[in-house]
From Swiss-Prot:
Organism the protein comes from: Synechocystis sp. (strain ATCC 27184 / PCC 6803 / Kazusa)
Phylogenetic placement of the source organism: Bacteria, Bacillati, Cyanobacteriota, Cyanophyceae, Synechococcales
Protein family per UniProt: Belongs to the UbiA prenyltransferase family.
EC number: 2.5.1.115
Biological role stated in the UniProt entry: Involved in the synthesis of tocopherol (vitamin E). Catalyzes the condensation of homogentisate and phytyl diphosphate to form dimethylphytylhydrquinone.
Protein name per UniProt: Homogentisate phytyltransferase
An example molecular function term from Gene Ontology annotations: prenyltransferase activity
Any one GO biological process: vitamin E biosynthetic process
Main location group: membrane
Length: 308
């Protein structure tokens, strides 16, 4: 049980949840309105295979980062299993290596677009953490890595993989573009805020984060502005969208989350590492919710049509 708990912490649960929701949300966007059965064996093989490949790739990326950040994590994240000794470095290497190989094998076995999606993600994740490249040393490049994988590669790559696998033309339609743009900007906010709780270790090991360059107050404000823009843009788009959509649900849900964001931000004291970390996890919860709310807004009109 202790080993399982350590592995769960090693996998960085918030990223595992985010990866899971992104795979299933993109799958739902693929089938919505196209008349394909969610329960057909062929479609479920595709989504479960993609889910497993992406989860293994996720563990590879976050695990590799921990292997190269052990000393920093002993200051910033002492609860992680490599930093506190629950896993040895050798064990960490085995986990990362096996997950990376298995992820690529499954992805390429299922198809070109999934192979490219996972392969590109792993290459960027490696460049993010591993010297001599180690892009995480530079705030702009670090943010670019995160938004490229989470915002672009995963959403568009998975969508094309599912489209082709389900027999649809390999075209990127409006719903996936809207989700991708929202997630892209949202991921920028996550990328710039993620280092606010880690100032002490980053300063000591000369990691040039945006927080150290412009201060945590400015990063905090910038994060709120970016997230506000995301929610307002989605609500405005809902008014003008020329496609089947539950407009009221989309607008009300996003404005409610925007209000919750600002209400929650009032309680954050930037001198408290605990409160900053808690707010960072709250931002991830908002990220999770988007992958639930957006497909639901597209599904509700179809659902109501089948009822009435």
């Amino acid at each position: 049980m202790a080993t399982i708990q350590a592995f769960w912490r090693f996998s960085r649960p918030h990223t595992i949840i985010g990866t899971t929701l992104s795979v299933w949300a993109v799958y739902l966007l693929t089938i919505l309105g196209d008349g394909n059965s969610v329960n057909s064996p062929a479609s479920l093989d595709l989504v479960f295979g993609a889910w497993l490949a992406c989860l293994l790739g996720n563990v590879y990326i976050v695990g590799l980062n921990q292997l190269w950040d052990v000393d920093i994590d002993r200051i910033n994240k002492p609860n992680l299993p490599l930093a506190n000794g629950d896993f040895s470095i050798a064990q960490g290497r085995w986990i990362v290596g096996l997950c990376g190989v298995a992820s690529l094998a499954i992805a390429w076995g299922l198809g070109l677009w999934l192979g490219l999606t996972v392969g590109i993600s792993l290459i960027i994740g490696t460049a993010y953490s591993v010297p001599p490249v180690r892009l995480k040393r530079f705030s702009l490049l670090a943010a670019l890595c995160i938004l490229t994988v989470r915002g672009i590669v995963v959403n568009l790559g998975l969508f094309l993989f599912f489209r082709i696998g389900l027999g649809y033309p390999p075209t990127l339609i409006t719903p996936i573009w809207v989700l991708t743009l929202f997630i892209l900007v949202f991921t920028v906010a996550i990328a710039i805020f993620k280092d606010v709780p880690d100032m002490e270790g980053d300063r000591q090991f000369k990691i040039q984060t945006l927080t150290l360059q412009i201060g945590k107050q400015n990063v905090f404000r910038g994060t709120l502005i970016l997230l506000t823009g995301c929610y307002l843009a989605m609500a405005i788009w809902g008014l003008w969208a020329a496609m089947p959509l539950n407009t009221a649900f989309l607008i009300v849900s996003h404005l409610c989350l925007l209000a919750l964001l600002w209400w929650r931000s009032r309680d954050v004291h930037l001198e408290s590492k605990t409160e900053i970390a808690s707010f960072y996890q709250f931002i991830w919860k908002l990220f999770f919710l988007e992958y639930l709310l957006y497909p639901l807004a597209l599904w509700l009109p179809n659902f109501s049509n089948t009822i009435f």
